[in-house]
Protein backbone atom coordinates (compact mmCIF):
# COMPACT_ATOMS: atom_id res chain seq x y z
CA UNK A 1 0.00 0.00 0.00
CA UNK A 2 1.04 3.62 -0.57
CA UNK A 3 -0.27 6.89 0.83
CA UNK A 4 -2.05 9.17 -1.64
CA UNK A 5 -2.94 11.81 0.95
CA UNK A 6 -2.11 12.54 4.57
CA UNK A 7 -3.83 14.88 7.05
CA UNK A 8 -2.10 16.14 10.20
CA UNK A 9 -3.57 17.73 13.29
CA UNK A 10 -1.49 19.06 16.20
CA UNK A 11 1.65 17.34 14.92
CA UNK A 12 4.92 19.14 15.74
CA UNK A 13 4.59 22.73 14.46
CA UNK A 14 1.37 22.12 12.52
CA UNK A 15 -2.12 22.93 13.79
CA UNK A 16 -3.65 21.38 10.69
CA UNK A 17 -2.12 20.31 7.38
CA UNK A 18 -3.29 18.27 4.38
CA UNK A 19 -0.75 16.95 1.86
CA UNK A 20 -1.40 15.37 -1.55
CA UNK A 21 0.99 12.44 -2.10
CA UNK A 22 -0.71 11.00 -5.19
CA UNK A 23 2.28 11.79 -7.45
CA UNK A 24 4.93 9.10 -7.91
CA UNK A 25 7.43 11.29 -6.05
CA UNK A 26 7.10 14.38 -3.87
CA UNK A 27 9.59 17.17 -3.17
CA UNK A 28 9.28 19.35 -0.07
CA UNK A 29 11.17 22.64 -0.01
CA UNK A 30 11.21 25.74 2.15
CA UNK A 31 13.19 27.73 4.69
CA UNK A 32 14.90 26.14 7.67
CA UNK A 33 12.49 25.40 10.49
CA UNK A 34 9.34 25.50 8.35
CA UNK A 35 8.52 21.83 9.02
CA UNK A 36 9.90 19.88 6.03
CA UNK A 37 11.43 17.16 8.18
CA UNK A 38 8.30 17.07 10.36
CA UNK A 39 6.23 16.19 7.27
CA UNK A 40 8.58 13.30 6.48
CA UNK A 41 8.47 12.29 10.14
CA UNK A 42 4.66 12.24 10.11
CA UNK A 43 4.67 9.89 7.11
CA UNK A 44 7.13 7.61 8.89
CA UNK A 45 5.07 7.65 12.11
CA UNK A 46 1.95 6.83 10.09
CA UNK A 47 3.63 3.85 8.44
CA UNK A 48 5.63 2.49 11.38
CA UNK A 49 4.17 3.84 14.63
CA UNK A 50 7.61 5.25 15.44
CA UNK A 51 9.66 8.38 14.80
CA UNK A 52 13.12 8.45 13.23
CA UNK A 53 13.97 11.51 15.35
CA UNK A 54 12.93 10.54 18.89
CA UNK A 55 11.70 7.62 20.97
CA UNK A 56 9.34 9.94 22.86
CA UNK A 57 6.17 10.14 20.75
CA UNK A 58 4.57 12.49 23.26
CA UNK A 59 7.09 15.15 22.20
CA UNK A 60 5.49 15.13 18.72
CA UNK A 61 2.27 16.64 20.12
CA UNK A 62 2.07 20.35 19.31
CA UNK A 63 2.65 22.58 22.31
CA UNK A 64 -0.64 23.36 24.01
CA UNK A 65 -2.49 20.38 22.48
CA UNK A 66 -3.47 17.15 24.21
CA UNK A 67 -2.90 14.76 21.30
CA UNK A 68 -1.80 14.51 17.68
CA UNK A 69 -3.77 12.84 14.92
CA UNK A 70 -2.58 11.53 11.55
CA UNK A 71 -4.97 10.29 8.88
CA UNK A 72 -3.52 8.70 5.75
CA UNK A 73 -5.37 7.49 2.68
CA UNK A 74 -4.58 4.88 0.05
CA UNK A 75 -6.71 5.55 -3.03
CA UNK A 76 -5.64 2.29 -4.68
CA UNK A 77 -7.20 0.11 -1.98
CA UNK A 78 -9.58 2.57 -0.38
CA UNK A 79 -7.84 2.05 2.96
CA UNK A 80 -7.89 4.74 5.64
CA UNK A 81 -5.23 4.74 8.34
CA UNK A 82 -5.57 6.72 11.55
CA UNK A 83 -2.85 7.21 14.17
CA UNK A 84 -3.62 8.94 17.47
CA UNK A 85 -1.26 9.69 20.34
CA UNK A 86 -2.57 11.41 23.45
CA UNK A 87 -0.48 12.50 26.42
CA UNK A 88 0.14 9.71 28.97
CA UNK A 89 -1.61 7.18 26.68
CA UNK A 90 -0.15 4.59 24.29
CA UNK A 91 -0.32 5.15 20.55
CA UNK A 92 -3.58 4.05 18.95
CA UNK A 93 -3.52 2.77 15.35
CA UNK A 94 -6.50 1.86 13.18
CA UNK A 95 -6.84 0.70 9.59
CA UNK A 96 -10.37 1.06 8.23
CA UNK A 97 -11.54 1.68 11.81
CA UNK A 98 -10.08 -1.63 13.07
CA UNK A 99 -7.33 -1.46 15.69
CA UNK A 100 -4.01 -2.95 14.55
CA UNK A 101 -0.61 -3.63 16.11
CA UNK A 102 2.58 -1.91 15.01
CA UNK A 103 3.79 -5.10 13.28
CA UNK A 104 0.52 -5.26 11.30
CA UNK A 105 0.90 -1.59 10.41
CA UNK A 106 4.46 -2.07 9.14
CA UNK A 107 3.35 -4.92 6.88
CA UNK A 108 0.38 -2.95 5.53
CA UNK A 109 2.39 0.22 4.80
CA UNK A 110 6.07 -0.75 4.43
CA UNK A 111 8.45 2.20 4.52
CA UNK A 112 12.13 2.85 5.02
CA UNK A 113 13.76 6.04 6.30
CA UNK A 114 16.93 7.24 4.57
CA UNK A 115 18.48 9.93 6.76
CA UNK A 116 21.94 11.33 7.49
CA UNK A 117 22.94 8.21 9.45
CA UNK A 118 22.17 6.01 6.45
CA UNK A 119 24.85 7.73 4.37
CA UNK A 120 27.44 6.65 6.95
CA UNK A 121 25.99 3.17 7.39
CA UNK A 122 29.32 1.37 7.70
CA UNK A 123 30.65 3.90 10.22
CA UNK A 124 27.67 3.59 12.55
CA UNK A 125 27.48 1.26 15.54
CA UNK A 126 26.71 -2.44 14.90
CA UNK A 127 23.40 -2.03 16.76
CA UNK A 128 22.26 0.61 14.24
CA UNK A 129 23.28 -1.57 11.27
CA UNK A 130 21.41 -4.56 12.69
CA UNK A 131 18.28 -2.47 13.29
CA UNK A 132 18.30 -1.24 9.70
CA UNK A 133 18.80 -4.77 8.42
CA UNK A 134 16.09 -6.14 10.71
CA UNK A 135 13.58 -3.50 9.61
CA UNK A 136 14.06 -4.35 5.96
CA UNK A 137 13.65 -8.05 6.66
CA UNK A 138 10.59 -7.56 8.88
CA UNK A 139 8.93 -5.90 5.90
CA UNK A 140 10.17 -8.34 3.27
CA UNK A 141 9.70 -11.67 5.05
CA UNK A 142 6.99 -12.91 7.39
CA UNK A 143 9.29 -15.78 8.41
CA UNK A 144 11.88 -13.33 9.70
CA UNK A 145 9.62 -11.89 12.40
CA UNK A 146 8.68 -15.40 13.57
CA UNK A 147 12.32 -16.45 13.88
CA UNK A 148 13.39 -13.10 15.36
CA UNK A 149 10.81 -13.28 18.15
CA UNK A 150 11.45 -17.01 18.58
CA UNK A 151 15.18 -16.44 18.97
CA UNK A 152 14.94 -13.66 21.54
CA UNK A 153 12.15 -15.39 23.46
CA UNK A 154 14.34 -18.51 23.74
CA UNK A 155 17.35 -16.38 24.70
CA UNK A 156 15.39 -14.65 27.46
CA UNK A 157 14.11 -17.95 28.85
CA UNK A 158 17.58 -19.48 28.66
CA UNK A 159 19.11 -16.53 30.53
CA UNK A 160 16.40 -16.76 33.21
CA UNK A 161 17.19 -20.44 33.71
CA UNK A 162 20.90 -19.64 34.03
CA UNK A 163 20.19 -16.99 36.68
CA UNK A 164 18.25 -19.59 38.64
CA UNK A 165 21.14 -22.02 38.29
CA UNK A 166 19.04 -24.51 36.30
CA UNK A 167 21.69 -25.63 33.80
CA UNK A 168 19.61 -28.51 32.44
CA UNK A 169 16.70 -26.19 31.67
CA UNK A 170 19.04 -23.64 30.09
CA UNK A 171 20.54 -26.28 27.79
CA UNK A 172 17.04 -27.27 26.66
CA UNK A 173 16.78 -23.91 24.87
CA UNK A 174 20.05 -24.35 22.94
CA UNK A 175 18.48 -26.23 19.98
CA UNK A 176 15.83 -23.51 19.60
CA UNK A 177 18.47 -20.77 19.67
CA UNK A 178 20.55 -22.57 17.04
CA UNK A 179 17.53 -23.28 14.83
CA UNK A 180 16.14 -19.73 14.90
CA UNK A 181 19.62 -18.19 14.72
CA UNK A 182 20.64 -20.14 11.62
CA UNK A 183 17.45 -19.13 9.81
CA UNK A 184 17.94 -15.48 10.78
CA UNK A 185 21.50 -15.51 9.45
CA UNK A 186 20.39 -17.14 6.19
CA UNK A 187 17.70 -14.51 5.60
CA UNK A 188 20.19 -11.73 6.40
CA UNK A 189 22.77 -13.19 4.02
CA UNK A 190 20.18 -13.51 1.25
CA UNK A 191 19.13 -9.88 1.69
CA UNK A 192 22.73 -8.65 1.59
CA UNK A 193 23.33 -10.67 -1.60
CA UNK A 194 20.24 -9.18 -3.25
CA UNK A 195 21.17 -5.63 -2.20
CA UNK A 196 24.73 -6.12 -3.49
CA UNK A 197 23.41 -7.24 -6.89
CA UNK A 198 21.21 -4.14 -7.13
CA UNK A 199 24.09 -1.93 -5.95
CA UNK A 200 26.49 -3.41 -8.52
CA UNK A 201 23.92 -2.86 -11.27
CA UNK A 202 23.44 0.81 -10.30
CA UNK A 203 27.21 1.42 -10.11
CA UNK A 204 27.67 -0.22 -13.53
CA UNK A 205 25.05 2.07 -15.08
CA UNK A 206 26.64 5.14 -13.49
CA UNK A 207 30.07 4.16 -14.85
CA UNK A 208 28.62 3.71 -18.35
CA UNK A 209 26.86 7.09 -18.18
CA UNK A 210 30.08 8.79 -17.05
CA UNK A 211 31.97 7.22 -19.95
CA UNK A 212 29.36 8.50 -22.42
CA UNK A 213 29.56 11.96 -20.84
CA UNK A 214 33.34 12.01 -21.34
Describe every region a protein language model picked out.
Residues 42-43, 110-113, 175:
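Short hydrophobic/aromatic segments of transmembrane alpha-helices and their interfaces
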Residues 45-48, 160:
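Regular, well-ordered alpha-helical segments
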Residues 211-214:
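Pre-NBD coupling/linker segments of ABC/ABC-like ATPases
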Residues 120-209:
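An accessory alpha-helical subdomain
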Residues 1-45:
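Pre-Walker A-like glycine/lysine-rich segment at the N-terminus of P-loop NTPase domains
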Residues 47-128, 137-140, 144, 196-204:
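Nucleotide-state sensing region of NTPase/ATPase domains
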Residues 36, 40-41, 57, 133-134, ...:
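Alpha-helical structural signal
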Residues 30-35, 49, 125, 181:
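Glycine-centered flexibility sites
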